[in-house]
């Protein structure tokens, strides 16, 4: 299969708004791949259209593809060739590896046509936003293979790998999906939570009673044990066993021989309060597989059980899974929780959890099963919403459904000491179609100098520099006049921005035309919030 076939399909899907049309177009491509009888080919295509490489990370970022050779006139690259080239780039190491990687990348782009270069650039920089998320892809796999979507989703849930499920279904049919069962040692997609506005909202949505759990500001891990063999996986299913020996030891101390559990690994201070998130995250870095990738010891707290000693618990209600967890894990290694129908008791539990330095609470339906790999209605997260009034410093041209619109906004806090602004991050989250249309017109009016026009191959801009601008053809620097109200989950230490801080999970609430830039929140306010949280 030629790369251009995948690139054209990606462009088609990005231009479609109807879910059924997206599903049909992807299914058409998967059927074409399946007719070649190569399971690996199907797996690669599904991975790419999901915005991922089969190799996960190959050491290529925006700067690597910012300047590429002129495109080829005719398509010649095959999917197999490109996948092999990605593998070669990713495995390049040692002296001169950077130059070698650049040369391999240049050769690849020189052989690619214009539409292929656009696809490759977006794929390699994580900007392939085309609306082909997991649900759409699962439906497309089902349509291509003639398999009910529910069967595909279940297999992907248990196998933790939709591309592998797609390869089996498209090449060998529904019977091939029987191999995807819950297996100790093979990670499954974690169940995710929806959002509630508060504890009363959560109680109402669960019929009056809910299980509330402390939401720790650590790193979620999935732990597998068979005998003396323990594996620890991240939320994204990466194996981090060698980096977390204390988690392995804690698991081996439990009175079971087989186990699959959900837990939170977190760095705690001597007084029991959490360290800032970066301390925990340092133990999950990519600097090798030894504990010295971070020096702070982690504590592990278990909160759910998917399998215990030969018994699968996925389909059991939360209450029964928790009862098995309580019989397996000591109290001091379990996340704090409260089962209640009393809104005041639930609020007091939330307040105490926040006072202890944690993120908020999870509210869970006592009767819900574990929906692996899905954002299930049986789990709700309740966290305080922080907001800041910030100033837009620059905007990037969008991609996918945002093509032709100014989208990703650069956010800055006012610096009273200098009269300037300090960048704290970027976001396009929370923007409606109406907002995108309005802000495109607005920010072109505020453009500081000649604004670069949107082009067919625009993508995300590279990381912002200290002056927050980027003369890269994708970013429009604007006069710092427009105030925007931003919601965020926290403030983290960051070396990426000149203020040393960045917003976590920033999203747009609304534009504040009633405020001037002089009324925006200051960097001192942001710094105080950061220090208070840490």
UniProtKB/Swiss-Prot annotation:
<dbReference type="GO" id="GO:0003677">
    <property type="term" value="F:DNA binding"/>
</dbReference>
<comment type="similarity">
    <text>Belongs to the ATP-dependent DNA ligase family.</text>
</comment>
<feature type="binding site">
    <location>
        <position position="303"/>
    </location>
    <ligand>
        <name>ATP</name>
    </ligand>
</feature>
<feature type="binding site">
    <location>
        <position position="381"/>
    </location>
    <ligand>
        <name>ATP</name>
    </ligand>
</feature>
<keyword id="KW-0233">DNA recombination</keyword>
<feature type="binding site">
    <location>
        <position position="235"/>
    </location>
    <ligand>
        <name>ATP</name>
    </ligand>
</feature>
<feature type="active site" description="N6-AMP-lysine intermediate">
    <location>
        <position position="215"/>
    </location>
</feature>
<dbReference type="GO" id="GO:0046872">
    <property type="term" value="F:metal ion binding"/>
</dbReference>
<dbReference type="InterPro" id="IPR016059">
    <property type="entry name" value="DNA_ligase_ATP-dep_CS"/>
</dbReference>
<dbReference type="Pfam" id="PF04679">
    <property type="entry name" value="DNA_ligase_A_C"/>
</dbReference>
<keyword id="KW-0460">Magnesium</keyword>
<feature type="binding site">
    <location>
        <position position="213"/>
    </location>
    <ligand>
        <name>ATP</name>
    </ligand>
</feature>
<feature type="binding site">
    <location>
        <position position="375"/>
    </location>
    <ligand>
        <name>ATP</name>
    </ligand>
</feature>
<dbReference type="GO" id="GO:0003910">
    <property type="term" value="F:DNA ligase (ATP) activity"/>
</dbReference>
<dbReference type="InterPro" id="IPR000977">
    <property type="entry name" value="DNA_ligase_ATP-dep"/>
</dbReference>
<keyword id="KW-0235">DNA replication</keyword>
<protein>
    <recommendedName>
        <fullName>Probable DNA ligase</fullName>
        <ecNumber>6.5.1.1</ecNumber>
    </recommendedName>
</protein>
<keyword id="KW-0131">Cell cycle</keyword>
<feature type="binding site">
    <location>
        <position position="264"/>
    </location>
    <ligand>
        <name>ATP</name>
    </ligand>
</feature>
<dbReference type="InterPro" id="IPR012310">
    <property type="entry name" value="DNA_ligase_ATP-dep_cent"/>
</dbReference>
<keyword id="KW-0132">Cell division</keyword>
<dbReference type="InterPro" id="IPR036599">
    <property type="entry name" value="DNA_ligase_N_sf"/>
</dbReference>
<dbReference type="GO" id="GO:0006260">
    <property type="term" value="P:DNA replication"/>
</dbReference>
<dbReference type="GO" id="GO:0051301">
    <property type="term" value="P:cell division"/>
</dbReference>
<dbReference type="Pfam" id="PF04675">
    <property type="entry name" value="DNA_ligase_A_N"/>
</dbReference>
<dbReference type="GO" id="GO:0006310">
    <property type="term" value="P:DNA recombination"/>
</dbReference>
<dbReference type="InterPro" id="IPR022865">
    <property type="entry name" value="DNA_ligae_ATP-dep_bac/arc"/>
</dbReference>
<dbReference type="Pfam" id="PF01068">
    <property type="entry name" value="DNA_ligase_A_M"/>
</dbReference>
<keyword id="KW-0234">DNA repair</keyword>
<dbReference type="InterPro" id="IPR012340">
    <property type="entry name" value="NA-bd_OB-fold"/>
</dbReference>
<keyword id="KW-0436">Ligase</keyword>
<keyword id="KW-0067">ATP-binding</keyword>
<dbReference type="InterPro" id="IPR012308">
    <property type="entry name" value="DNA_ligase_ATP-dep_N"/>
</dbReference>
<dbReference type="GO" id="GO:0071897">
    <property type="term" value="P:DNA biosynthetic process"/>
</dbReference>
<dbReference type="InterPro" id="IPR012309">
    <property type="entry name" value="DNA_ligase_ATP-dep_C"/>
</dbReference>
<keyword id="KW-0227">DNA damage</keyword>
<dbReference type="InterPro" id="IPR050191">
    <property type="entry name" value="ATP-dep_DNA_ligase"/>
</dbReference>
<keyword id="KW-0547">Nucleotide-binding</keyword>
<dbReference type="GO" id="GO:0005524">
    <property type="term" value="F:ATP binding"/>
</dbReference>
<dbReference type="GO" id="GO:0006281">
    <property type="term" value="P:DNA repair"/>
</dbReference>
<keyword id="KW-0479">Metal-binding</keyword>
<feature type="binding site">
    <location>
        <position position="220"/>
    </location>
    <ligand>
        <name>ATP</name>
    </ligand>
</feature>
């Amino acid at each position: 299969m030629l790369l251009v076939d995948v690139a054209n399909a990606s462009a088609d899907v990005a231009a479609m708004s109807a879910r059924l049309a997206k599903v049909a177009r992807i299914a058409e491509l998967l059927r074409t791949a399946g007719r070649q009888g190569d399971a690996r080919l199907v797996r690669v295509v599904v991975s790419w259209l999901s915005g991922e490489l089969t190799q996960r990370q190959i050491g290529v970022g925006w700067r690597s593809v910012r300047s590429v050779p002129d495109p080829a006139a005719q398509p010649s690259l095959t999917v197999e060739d490109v996948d092999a080239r990605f593998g070669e780039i990713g495995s390049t190491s040692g002296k001169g590896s950077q130059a070698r990687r650049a040369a391999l990348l240049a050769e690849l782009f020189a052989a690619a046509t214009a539409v292929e270069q656009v696809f490759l650039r977006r794929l390699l920089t994580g900007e392939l936003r085309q609306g082909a998320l997991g649900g759409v892809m699962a439906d497309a796999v089902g349509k291509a293979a003639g398999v009910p979507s529910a069967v595909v989703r279940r297999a992907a849930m248990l196998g933790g790998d939709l591309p592998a499920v797609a390869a089996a279904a498209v090449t060998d049919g529904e019977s091939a999906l029987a191999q995807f069962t819950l297996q100790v040692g093979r990670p499954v997609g974690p169940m995710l939570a929806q959002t509630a506005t508060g504890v009363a909202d959560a109680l109402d949505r669960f019929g009056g009673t809910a299980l509330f759990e402390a939401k720790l500001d650590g790193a979620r891990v999935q732990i597998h044990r068979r005998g003396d063999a323990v594996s620890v996986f991240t939320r994204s299913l990466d194996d981090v066993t060698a980096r977390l020996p204390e988690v392995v030891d804690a698991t081996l101390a439990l009175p079971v021989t087989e186990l699959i559990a959900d837990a939170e690994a977190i760095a705690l201070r001597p007084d029991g309060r959490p360290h800032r998130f970066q301390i925990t995250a340092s133990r999950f870095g990519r600097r090798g597989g030894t504990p010295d990738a971070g020096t702070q010891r982690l504590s592990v707290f278990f909160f759910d059980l998917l399998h215990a000693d030969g018994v699968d618990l996925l389909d059991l209600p939360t209450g029964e899974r928790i009862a098995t967890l309580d019989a397996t894990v000591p109290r001091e290694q379990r996340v704090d929780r409260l089962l209640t129908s009393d809104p005041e008791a639930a609020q007091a539990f939330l307040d105490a959890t926040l006072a202890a330095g944690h993120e908020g609470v999870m509210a869970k339906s006592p009767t819900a099963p574990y929906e692996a790999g899905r954002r299930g209605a049986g789990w709700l997260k309740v966290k305080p919403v922080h907001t800041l009034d910030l100033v837009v410093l620059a905007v990037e041209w969008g991609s996918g459904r945002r093509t032709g619109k100014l989208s990703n906004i650069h956010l800055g806090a006012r610096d009273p000491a200098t009269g300037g602004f300090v960048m704290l991050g970027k976001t396009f989250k929370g923007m409606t179609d109406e907002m995108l249309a309005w802000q495109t017109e607005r920010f072109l009016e505020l453009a500081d100098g000649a604004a670069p026009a949107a082009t067919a191959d625009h993508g995300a801009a590279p990381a912002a520099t200290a002056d927050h601008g980027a003369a890269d053809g994708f970013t429009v620097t604007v006069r710092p006049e427009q105030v925007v109200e931003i919601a965020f989950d926290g403030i983290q230490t960051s070396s990426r921005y000149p203020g040393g801080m960045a917003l976590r999970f920033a999203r747009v609430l609304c534009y504040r035309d009633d405020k001037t830039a002089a009324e925006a929140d200051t960097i001192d306010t942001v710094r105080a919030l950061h220090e208070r949280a840490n």
